[in-house]
Amino acid sequence: MSEQLSIADARQAEAIGRQVVLQGWVRTRRDSKAGFSFLELNDGSCFGNIQVIASADLENYEQEIKKLSAGCSVSVVGLVKESPGKGQTTEIEATAVTVHGLADTETYPLQKKRHSFEFLRTIAHLRPRTNTFGAIARVRNCICNSIHQFFQEDGFLYIHTPVITTSDCEGAGEMFQVTTLELDKVPKTEAKVDFTQDFFDRPAYLTVSGQLEAEIFACGLGKVYTFGPTFRAENSNTARHLAEFWMVEPEMAFYDLEDNMRVAERMLKRIFRDVLEKCPEDMEFFNLRIDKTVIETLEKIIDADFVRLPYTEAVDILTASGEKFEFPVDWGTDLQSEHERYLTEKHFQCPVILYDYPRQIKPFYMRVNDDGHTVRAMDVLVPKVGEIIGGSQREERLDVLQQRMKEQNLEPEGYWWYLDLRRYGTVPHSGFGLGLERVLQFVTGMANIRDVIPFPRTPGTAEF
């Protein structure tokens, strides 16, 4: 009796001699004058294809098998044999090929030629069938699994924070509003929208971060993390911005900024190590076709110590560098991507953790240092991408937190529960946010962030 195998398993030497059922999509078909056809089959379980040898003796050979083309779906029953072909361990000698669905060669968008990533974004429902996007999906899966394993093995609890919220973690106001009010008949009181008639009885938004809610659980359960979609209504049409993306956000009670840095560094190294070990074919593809330095870069980072650098020293290095930056460097301004890349690619040539940023450019929840001018913020910078992690030690002192909220014109009534955490058993605690898509860009070398998420959401684009 035949056993169903993935193509990933059927390509291993251990499968030789087994009668199997494989299912997948045809990549190519070529016919031999000797009376058989070679099918290249892929099912998404791995980067590589498996070769199927279909004999002319099969009953549907002339009517169906010889009409197969890229995109057709089939089931194959056959014997796994050692392949004499170069670069492949096994092949399948088919005893039956069942055709499930054909793909018209005249209209099927994925032809043998290379397609631009811009074109593939217009057919996001088909791009997982390409080498590039199949590889991205597998690496994305590996990274997510690695993140969960890292935190679970370290005693963190995985919690779920709300997607719909009434608070703005970043205080930037760039949030998507959620409402059931009819937009052409919005109820008003004294020229203002009457939100008491809305679903939640108040303004509600899609979350920009689960951090504040994660702090609730950290301040009762110790170490937690959340991993889910977040939303930013920034009108940014760049290769680094999405309106919807995925974030992992750990929060740790009794952790200071140094502890926070250590967790962030260990997590990144674990992710990079797992990707290299578990997705070798996919990474070889990215190294060959996208960026010839990705594997070497990851290997160097795994073996390197991340540089810890105060913001003030970073500004001194940048101003003394002699580089002509598009954006001038001054103490008190946020560093731009070009500054971050100079530090990681030219000056230190390794990842850098910047910390102790100016108070006025960071959110209200970051702990104020004793100098009164800086806060316990940190950003992890990596070559080619720049910032990949942002975090801080949180402000645990009630009076200081209230003053910071006042400075940033935040209404304390909307954060009463957040202030309560400082009233009852307050504790030093820290956390950070890691953008999944930024990590994927770095690991794969993909230039545009829209190509590392299945269905990109950007200004003017919400297809599928």
Where do the PLM segments sit?
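Class II aminoacyl-tRNA synthetase-like tRNA-binding/catalytic domains
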Residues: 2-249, 253
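Generic non-transmembrane alpha-helical segments
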Residues: 146-154, 267-278
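A translation/RNA-centric and nucleic-acid-associated enzymatic feature enriched
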Residues: 164, 174-273, 284-464
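Residue-level recognition of alpha-helix termini/interfacial anchor residues
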Residues: 61, 278-282
